[in-house]
Amino acid sequence: MKNLFILLFLSSILLTSCSSTSGTVKGTVCYPSEYIPAMNVYLKNKETSKIYSLDIKENQKPFKFKKIPAGNYIAFAYTVQEISTDANNKSAIANGGYTHAVPCGLTVECKDHSLLVFKVVNGKTTKNIEICDWFGAVMADKAP
């Protein structure tokens, strides 16, 4: 009887882990300054356009999104406060992203600043999403 209970318990754990309908996304934010400003980090599903957001405190580097549905995503961030100046010399919030330039090394030779699509898989953790390109990531003028 004891062995049957153990078998049923282990089977339920296995079924629960196999039926996961979401994944986790872990990464870091960088900022070209001596500190990291408070910001909002976003994941956008490429198929549904649904956006997930997370608040990052000042000088916080790591972030973690839980229960993100499987799919293809892009990651980007906007500062909470206006800390940059636009082309018209007007204060603006800054934005950055996880772009093709990030895995390239963010050097002068890295010309592709388009957002990099990554996959979230059910029951898995997608790691190393680095929102570090604050010089060429092209996004909307305002945060979602």
Identify what each model region corresponds to:
Residues 1-4:
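Positively charged n-region of N-terminal signal peptides that target proteins for export
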Residues 15-17:
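C-terminal motif of bacterial Sec signal peptides marking the signal peptidase cleavage site
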Residues 23-31, 131, 141-142:
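A short, amphipathic beta-strand motif
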Residues 32-49:
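Short, ordered, surface-exposed loop/turn motifs in non-cytosolic proteins
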Residues 53-58:
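Short beta-strand segments within Ig-like beta-sandwich modules, predominantly Fibronectin type-III
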Residues 59-67:
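Short, surface-exposed beta-strand/beta-hairpin micro-motifs centered on an aromatic residue
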Residues 71-87:
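A short, solvent-exposed beta-strand micro-motif common in secreted/extracellular proteins
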Residues 83-129:
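Structured interaction patches on ligand/partner-binding surfaces of diverse proteins
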